[in-house]
């Protein structure tokens, strides 16, 4: 451990006979040599008055308070002494990481200006790289180029024109998207032709073992003979169907009833019915097989499966509105148009409708509310009429016309509806647009940075001296903001501010810290430990 003089400067190792080391270690000091201070003067006033304590070297105040401190350098005669007068120097009063130590003797207890204290704000953890990138993208500037850049680069006007066109295009696409969303909510159908094929085959009776296939005798058949029977097929398909996926025939109907001749098959076996159930599997056709060798008259009742459901109006209301079979929403719309056209809405109480003579006959009242119309209308709606087809099942082998074709109108989903749904559900274009927007934002940000660098260099080349001074003032302001040091510029510009007691102590601390730093550097270079 090196010796330390009264001024606080670290000293090289003294000779074995020196008394500074002993005084620093708390040993009894050697007799004072010529020109040296007496031994008791090296001891501090103790815990009550100084920074030193038992076993620690004391520091005497210098300057007007006492004689100038002197220390002896190695290799110098005792008579050659170097006085150290002026500022107080020495180690800081206590460890910077420990409790505050009392002030050195002769110094009034002053406190540091609270405005110069650094506020310790808890530092938040830095965001992750992915979060930082996302935050940066959210805080990016708009895609519009600043006016200064547009004035500097006239060619950038083409980019601004494209940006204006893109804005109009985005508005148009957004409006069309909303229109598509509204259109999908409504039933979007188109009428197509469904061709129904009704055919039948006849299997004559055969005797068992008859390989020639001749018919049995009219008088009767043996016990092992095969009974004559016929089979009816009902199939169909859409005409000019552009879709690749063919729709099943049964999916067009809600129910199918085949009514056979009641006189031939009796009251219990003359009806063949099929009704759609939640668990029904779609099929391409229907087959009915019955025994018999006579021509049979049959009636086919086909009930279409309308989506949304359609209803048949009361004949009186149908003639009045001009609507026979339609959806509930279409019927309500036609009814409102009739009320509006004939001015049946009450002029004062707008929720009431004044019935004319036709409405009085249909609704059996002279006045009704709007809210009562759905309830009144429910009793006037019926299920739509089924499609009726009369067909004769022929068992004559010479009859070549055993297949009949019937065309009916059906409503199918418009292919455009599927394209609309795919357009709304597709996110490929949105992802591509978002990626391009990110690139545009990054490019604009890079352009702004380059513009800032250009202005920096241009200002420096125009007037280097004023630029450097202004830049230093800016850096000083930024440094105060970064280090959280808030000072008073008006006080700091005056010399009296730096003659306060805290300034002398701060200088001593600073010099001591610098000496310690240089000492550590010297030890590292020499590879030794100075003791």
From Swiss-Prot:
- What residue ranges carry the coiled-coil annotation? none
- One Pfam match, given by its short name, reads SWIB
Post-translation: what modifications?
A: Ubiquitinated through a signaling process involving RAC1 and the RING finger protein UNKL.
Biological process GO annotation list? Answer: chromatin remodeling; nucleosome disassembly; positive regulation of cell differentiation; positive regulation of double-strand break repair; positive regulation of myoblast differentiation; positive regulation of T cell differentiation; regulation of G0 to G1 transition; regulation of G1/S transition of mitotic cell cycle
Where in this protein does the record say Asymmetric dimethylarginine is found?
81, 104
User: Where can this protein be found?
Assistant: Nucleus
> Which keywords fit this entry according to its UniProt record?
Chromatin regulator, Isopeptide bond, Methylation, Nucleus, Phosphoprotein, Transcription, Transcription regulation, Ubl conjugation
Ranges for domain SWIB/MDM2 come to 306-383
Residues that bear Phosphoserine:
203
Q: Which residue positions does Phosphothreonine occur at?
A: 217
Q: Where is this cross-link: Glycyl lysine isopeptide (Lys-Gly) (interchain with G-Cter in SUMO2)?
A: 226
What cellular component GO annotations does this protein have? bBAF complex; brahma complex; chromatin; kinetochore; nuclear matrix; nucleoplasm; nucleus; protein-containing complex
Region spans: Disordered: 205-226
InterPro entries, alphabetically?
SMARCD2_SWIB_dom, SWIB_domain, SWIB_MDM2_dom_sf, SWIB_MDM2_domain
Q: Which CDD domains match?
A: SWIB_BAF60B
* Oligomeric form and interacting partners: Component of the multiprotein chromatin-remodeling complexes SWI/SNF: SWI/SNF-A (BAF), SWI/SNF-B (PBAF) and related complexes. The canonical complex contains a catalytic subunit (either SMARCA4/BRG1/BAF190A or SMARCA2/BRM/BAF190B), and at least SMARCE1, ACTL6A/BAF53, SMARCC1/BAF155, SMARCC2/BAF170, and SMARCB1/SNF5/BAF47. Other subunits specific to each of the complexes may also be present permitting several possible combinations developmentally and tissue specific.
* UniProt-recorded name of the protein: SWI/SNF-related matrix-associated actin-dependent regulator of chromatin subfamily D member 2
């Amino acid at each position: 451990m090196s010796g330390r003089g009264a001024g606080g400067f670290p000293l090289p190792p003294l000779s074995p006979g020196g008394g500074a080391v002993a005084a620093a270690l708390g040993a009894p000091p050697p007799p004072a040599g010529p020109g040296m201070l007496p031994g008791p003067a090296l001891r501090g006033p103790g815990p009550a008055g100084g920074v030193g304590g038992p076993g620690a070297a004391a520091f005497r105040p210098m300057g007007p308070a006492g004689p100038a401190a002197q220390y002896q350098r190695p290799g110098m005669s005792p008579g050659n002494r170097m006085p150290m007068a002026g500022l107080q120097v020495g180690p800081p009063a206590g460890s910077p990481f420990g409790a505050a130590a009392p002030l050195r003797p002769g110094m009034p207890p002053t406190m540091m200006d609270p405005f110069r204290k650094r506020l310790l704000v808890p530092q938040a953890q830095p965001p992750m790289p992915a979060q930082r990138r996302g935050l940066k993208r959210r805080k990016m500037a708009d895609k519009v180029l600043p006016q200064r850049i547009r004035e500097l680069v006239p060619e950038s006007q083409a980019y601004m024109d494209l940006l204006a066109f893109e804005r109009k295009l985005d508005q148009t696409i957004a409006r069309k998207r909303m229109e598509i969303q509204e259109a999908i909510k409504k039933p979007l159908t188109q009428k197509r032709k469904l061709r129904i094929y009704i055919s039948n085959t006849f299997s004559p009776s055969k005797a068992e073992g008859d390989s020639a296939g001749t018919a049995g005798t009219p008088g009767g058949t043996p016990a092992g003979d095969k009974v004559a029977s016929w089979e009816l097929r009902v199939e169909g398909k859409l005409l000019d169907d552009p879709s690749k996926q063919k729709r099943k025939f049964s999916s067009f109907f809600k129910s199918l009833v085949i009514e056979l001749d009641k006189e031939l098959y009796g009251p219990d076996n003359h009806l063949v019915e099929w009704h759609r159930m939640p668990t029904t599997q779609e099929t391409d056709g229907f087959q009915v097989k019955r025994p018999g060798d006579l021509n049979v008259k049959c009636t086919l009742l086909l009930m279409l499966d309308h989506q949304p459901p359609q209803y048949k109006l009361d004949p009186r209301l149908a003639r009045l509105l001009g609507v026979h079979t339609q959806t509930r929403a279409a019927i309500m719309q036609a009814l409102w148009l009739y009320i509006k056209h004939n001015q049946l809405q009450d002029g004062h109480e707008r929720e009431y409708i004044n019935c004319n003579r036709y409405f009085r006959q249909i609704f059996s009242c002279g006045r009704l509310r709007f809210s009562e119309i759905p309830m009144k209308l429910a009793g006037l709606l019926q299920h739509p009429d089924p499609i009726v087809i009369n067909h004769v099942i022929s068992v004559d082998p010479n009859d070549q016309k055993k297949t009949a074709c019937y065309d009916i109108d059906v409503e199918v989903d418009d292919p455009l509806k599927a394209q609309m749904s795919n357009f709304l559900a597709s996110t490929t274009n949105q992802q591509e647009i978002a990626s391009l927007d990110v690139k545009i934002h990054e490019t604009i940000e890079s352009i702004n940075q380059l513009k800032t660098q250009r202005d920096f260099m241009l200002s420096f080349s125009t007037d280097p001296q004023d630029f450097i001074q202004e830049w230093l003032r800016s850096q000083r302001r930024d440094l105060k903001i970064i280090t959280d040091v808030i000072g008073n510029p008006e006080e700091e510009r005056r010399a009296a501010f730096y003659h306060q007691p805290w300034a002398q102590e701060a200088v001593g601390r600073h010099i001591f810290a610098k000496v310690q730093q240089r000492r550590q550097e010297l030890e590292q270079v020499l590879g030794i430990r100075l003791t």
